[in-house]
């Protein structure tokens, strides 16, 4: 998973202030107000200290928590050809210091510090893994590692990450096929020019155990190696039976550290084994039925947080990821750099997990829960090659900073499921209760209250012969340019063209004495996407921008491993296109530009969404709209006090959700406009906010705390089931024992609040961990 951090020619790699991401207030008035508030601080920063313009400033904190929040001046993505301050997009960089201070141990942990991102849950067609939504749009396929798309459903780790970059808004000009919400770029650790060893050893409640190591060694003037290791084993606070363990290794070597030609070879391996969480079913919004819980209000059922509806001797999840990368670059001088990256990756996601399904209504009518078995056997492989040329030149008296590139990739997903013998997986009807005990019931149901996870569910598990293979081939060319007309005015433009082909094949198979014919589907789309942004700089440490961009989501966008799959209904349709507008501002204030403020107002429109048309066929006739505001802050008030946070408001509306069947008249199916027109996007809170701050009390003691707020989140477009709003508090304290050892205590969910953090299925909600306390020894030498 690792490769050399990439930056445009002449890029500055590190600086002590952070770019931020949170965009803006409603319209021009609020934007002007924000700028007015920031102006005095900005002017003070200019007169007091020119450090905000220094070419390279590296800050070393004096305490174990690395209290000074650090982030690069430029993105590690070489497609962003301007410093982050002058990039006309909302970009959030989560630096290593914030990841460490908050006690994050997974990608989803780290992303909770970024408002506007929500975590979805797995369901029948959607795999268990990192199901992410950005600005209301599904971004499941929009995760990249050092600029290369990372395919396959995974639960990603952070032990090998230097930082995490979140680009919000249309992402297709940068990454190809994608959603309108944005993308996530994971920046890997790579060999450095100094020797160091960093290690962590942590213990906590819920049987938490974790250890990591990060070792860098300089072999010669031009060669260095780096090795990252991780072991993790833990249960989940407040939840019965659920546990998981994983381990990973990530070595890398760089040749030519001080040469014009540099090559980095890296390998990443991570595998995990767990008993996955089942969550809690929703209370169906019925007007009748037994009042066994909060009858019919659409929230998750009112049972103890520890309630587990799964089966210990049936449920499991095993994953494995292997990624190898060769990154070669040559510096011709005069800021001209040629780079080529070749990567091969393979991942597997194999599971049986219990979805506490409420679709039959038995939860409310009879007080029983169907233990629906969601299963998957998936292997995904991908090979990609990316070549880019970046540099600077003068033309017509204007300075150009550009990147040109070519990308080729092939992705293949093989997906199947499990068959259980004996057993039916759907014994329920809407009119009869579901037996919950006795061998003849096969234990496919459980009582709503006090289910027995150790029910003796006996079966033989085999892989279904119905195996789907999806192959996706993509060819892309792109170009980006930042044109500096004057020191105050810049224009950022970019365009990308993609040739996208995807095929689905299901060979003929026989199951239960029934033969199913082979199925073959194909889609071929070409699409161009662009982005353009005009930047005005009131001062050297501020910018105001307006930008416009597009994105395309073709049929089969998920590559065969998600909900946006290829089917006969969509294979002949055009890509869904989104157009987005953003007005924002960024300021680096206080001496040295050590505190970053940002704000933006944005609007995204999709006017050819795939929905059911009046004739019952799927067509590109639907429409969606998201309007929103983001605010962000990151950096340091003083050398002792750091901060990282933001706020996002999203008004996400399904304007035209197509048509629904209303019955059959004279043999003809009748359709009417969807009753869900005008509803809020599912998995999209209207308001979300996050704030983390740390303060160094003495050279040896640092304390910190965080607050996360997420508004009500609907589980489906029907808007009748939802996870309630919640506020979570976290705390941290660290103590420097010696020059080499620091102890850090993290308490997450300080008040032990019961809340639900994963919702994207209308059947159940994911239960967040209860109060979790961990004590970690950070060792450096």
Label every PLM stretch briefly.
Residues 3, 55-194, 583:
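Acidic, small-polar-rich N-terminal luminal/periplasmic segments of exported/outer-membrane proteins
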Residues 232-237, 244, 249-331, 348-380, ...:
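Acidic/polar loop-and-plug regions of large Gram-negative outer-membrane beta-barrel proteins
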Residues 598-605, 620-717, 751, 780:
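Gram-negative outer-membrane beta-barrel transporters
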Residues 708-716, 734-781:
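C-terminal beta-signal and adjacent terminal beta-strands/loops
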């Amino acid at each position: 998973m690792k490769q050399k951090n990439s930056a445009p020619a002449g890029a500055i790699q590190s600086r002590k202030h952070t770019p931020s991401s949170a965009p803006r207030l409603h319209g021009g008035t609020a934007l002007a107000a924000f700028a007015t508030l920031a102006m005095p601080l900005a002017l003070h920063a200019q007169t007091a200290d020119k450090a905000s313009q220094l070419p390279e400033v590296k800050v070393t904190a004096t305490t174990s928590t690395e209290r000074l929040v650090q982030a690069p001046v430029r993105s590690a993505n070489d497609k962003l050809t301007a410093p982050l301050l002058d990039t006309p997009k909302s970009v959030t960089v989560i630096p290593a210091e914030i990841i460490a201070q908050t006690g994050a141990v997974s990608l989803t942990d780290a992303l909770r510090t970024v408002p506007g991102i929500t975590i979805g849950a797995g369901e029948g067609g959607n795999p268990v893994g990192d199901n992410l939504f950005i600005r209301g749009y599904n971004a499941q396929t929009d995760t990249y590692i050092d600029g290369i798309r990372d395919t396959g459903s995974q639960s990603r780790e952070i032990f090998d990450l230097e930082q995490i970059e979140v680009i919000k808004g249309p992402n297709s000009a940068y990454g190809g096929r994608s959603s309108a919400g944005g993308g996530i770029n994971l920046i890997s650790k790579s060999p450095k020019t100094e020797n160091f060893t960093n290690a962590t050893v942590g213990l906590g409640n819920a049987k938490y155990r974790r250890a990591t190591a990060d070792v860098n060694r300089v072999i010669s003037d031009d060669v260095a190696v780096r090795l990252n290791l991780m072991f993790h084993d833990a249960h989940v606070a407040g939840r019965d039976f659920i546990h998981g363990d994983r381990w990973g290794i990530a070595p890398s070597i760089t040749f030519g550290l001080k040469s014009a030609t540099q090559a980095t070879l890296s390998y990443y391996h991570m595998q995990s084994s767990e008993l996955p969480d089942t969550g809690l079913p929703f209370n169906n919004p019925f007007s009748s039925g037994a009042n066994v819980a909060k009858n019919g209000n659409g929230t998750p059922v009112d049972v103890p947080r520890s309630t587990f509806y799964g089966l210990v001797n049936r449920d499991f999840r095993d994953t494995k990821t292997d990624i190898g990368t060769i990154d070669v670059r040559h510096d011709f001088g005069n800021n001209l750099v040629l780079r080529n990256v070749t990567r091969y990756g393979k991942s597997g996601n194999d599971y049986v997990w219990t979805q506490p399904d409420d679709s039959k209504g038995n939860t409310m009518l009879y007080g029983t829960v169907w233990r629906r078995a969601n299963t998957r056997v998936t292997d995904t492989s991908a090979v990609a090659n990316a070549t880019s040329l970046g540099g600077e030149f003068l033309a017509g008296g204007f300075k150009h900073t550009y990147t040109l590139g070519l990308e080729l990739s092939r992705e293949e997903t093989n997906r199947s499921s499990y068959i259980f013998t004996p057993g039916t997986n759907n014994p329920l009807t809407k009119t009869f209760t579901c037996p919950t005990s006795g061998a003849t019931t096969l234990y496919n149901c459980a009582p709503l209250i006090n289910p027995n996870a150790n029910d003796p569910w006996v079966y033989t598990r085999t892989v279904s012969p119905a195996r789907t293979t999806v192959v996706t081939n993509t060819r892309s060319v792109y170009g980006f340019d930042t044109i500096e007309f004057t020191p105050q005015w810049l224009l950022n433009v970019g365009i990308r063209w993609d040739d996208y082909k995807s095929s689905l094949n299901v060979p003929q198979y026989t199951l239960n004495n029934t033969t199913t014919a082979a199925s073959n589907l194909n889609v071929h789309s070409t699409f161009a996407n662009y982005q353009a942004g005009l930047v005005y700089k009131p001062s050297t440490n501020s910018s105001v921008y307006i930008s416009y961009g597009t994105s395309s989501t073709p049929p089969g966008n998920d590559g065969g491993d998600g909900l946006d799959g290829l089917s006969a209904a969509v294979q002949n349709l055009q890509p869904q296109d989104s157009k987005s507008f953003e007005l924002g501002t960024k300021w680096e204030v206080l001496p040295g530009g050590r505190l970053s403020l940002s704000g933006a107002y944005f609007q995204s429109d999709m006017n050819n969404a795939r929905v059911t048309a009046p004739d019952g066929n799927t067509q590109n006739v639907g429409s969606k709209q998201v309007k929103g505001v983001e605010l962000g802050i990151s950096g340091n008030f003083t050398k002792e006090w750091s901060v990282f946070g933001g706020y996002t408001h999203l008004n996400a509306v399904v304007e035209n959700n197509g048509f629904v069947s209303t019955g059959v008249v004279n043999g003809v199916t009748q359709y009417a406009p969807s009753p869900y027109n005008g509803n809020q996007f599912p998995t999209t809170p209207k308001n979300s906010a996050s704030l983390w701050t740390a303060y160094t009390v003495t050279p040896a003691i640092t304390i910190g705390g965080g607050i996360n707020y997420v508004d009500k989140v609907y589980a489906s477009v029907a808007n009748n089931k939802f996870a309630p709003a919640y506020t979570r508090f976290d705390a941290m304290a660290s103590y420097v024992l010696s020059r080499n050892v620091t102890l850090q205590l993290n308490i997450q969910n300080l008040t032990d609040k019961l809340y639900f953090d994963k919702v994207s299925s209308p059947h159940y909600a994911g239960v967040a961990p209860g109060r979790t306390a961990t004590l970690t020894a950070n060792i450096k030498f």
